[in-house]
């Protein structure tokens, strides 16, 4: 009888442990690199704000999640996810086959493209290829950097933060910057110190979807976030967020 009770207790314990291990979380820590305006950035009070922040907060509200955002440098953001320091990453992360091989993604919550920014004094360049023999900047590890490296004859120069690339272009150290459309618009069209110096040329030359990244195999969290994403889109909350930050 004692053996039976012991075995029964063990079964109950293991079952409880299994349920706990795979239950959808009630709170999550989320990493973001707040140097990518207007998607994620720091405001005057050093608070993390932006499109992605508002979007995930809306998703969290729809699913009953509590979210704690952590400002994390891009070059270490995925390592933190690997080690369990964060439960998810939302930082304008393009869904690619290479990234999907290592991580799980939610459904795409918005779409963007890469675009080229050059000085207004450049009257001829319309594409990256037009800058052969010159340096073109981008943020390290981004799809923008990947696009620059595809073009023969162009020298790729990468930066830890995209703002540093625009600083270098303002001083003539590089001849162009490639980044996501909303970021390009922020620096070239809205930023006081740059809007008279830079211009966006051509059209977006990629079509990319942003997804929220989680550790491989965490289906419960992906499903929970996808449920929230669908609810946010159904209520057109994403349109309001887009209008607030991008338009």
Where are these regions (language model features)?
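Extracytoplasmic small-molecule ligand-binding "clamshell" domains
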Residues: 24-92
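Short helix-initiation/N-cap motifs at beta->coil->alpha
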Residues: 53, 68-79, 123, 140-143, ...
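Periplasmic-binding protein-like
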Residues: 34, 110-118, 181, 185, ...
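Alpha-to-beta junction loops
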Residues: 64-66, 83-91, 134-135, 171-183
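A conserved helix-loop-strand patch within extracytoplasmic ligand-binding domains
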Residues: 65, 69, 93-95, 105-156
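Ligand-binding clefts/hinges and TM-proximal coupling segments of bilobed small-molecule sensing domains
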Residues: 66, 143-159, 196-201, 227-247
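A ligand-binding cleft/hinge motif common to bilobed small-molecule-binding domains
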Residues: 79, 91-101, 147-150, 175-206
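Extended ligand-binding regions for polar small-molecule ligands
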Residues: 53-62, 122, 129, 134-135, ...
